[in-house]
């Protein structure tokens, strides 16, 4: 069975996400469990995995992957995402990932850390053509003895 160029390139996108995720998991997510959250709406899957969200971190990061079964992903990530915590709304600092277009995208979304670190927060993503924002909720555990 041969693999078409399109299938090979699609697999490369998933490989990039796996690499990004592995790096994030290995570099200091001890502050809390690193669990990927997924949302599927209108045939587009968005997966978000928190990276370094430590209390002493100045920059927080999230691995974000988009996968579409049919349509191109033309989202401008920096314009469509906001971090909400303690009544504050924080726009992303940077997107280090694939540019808009294609059916698969992955990258790292970076924010200036909210200080003091909230007990919980939401990553909200507004996408064109979707009735309401996608919401990814993160709750920090109390690890004190």
Residue ranges and their predicted role:
Residues 9-19:
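Bacterial N-terminal signal peptides that target proteins for export
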Residues 20-26:
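Bacterial N-terminal signal peptides
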Residues 33-56:
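Low-complexity, acidic Ser/Thr/Pro/Gly-rich terminal tails and inter-domain linkers that flank the onset
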Residues 40, 83-85:
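A general beta-strand register signal
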Residues 49-73:
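Short, surface-exposed binding/anchoring microloops in extracellular/periplasmic proteins
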Residues 74-79:
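Short coil-to-beta strand junction motifs in C2/discoidin
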Residues 87-137:
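Short, solvent-exposed, Trp/other aromatic-anchored flexible loops in extracytoplasmic proteins
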Residues 137-145:
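Short beta-strand elements
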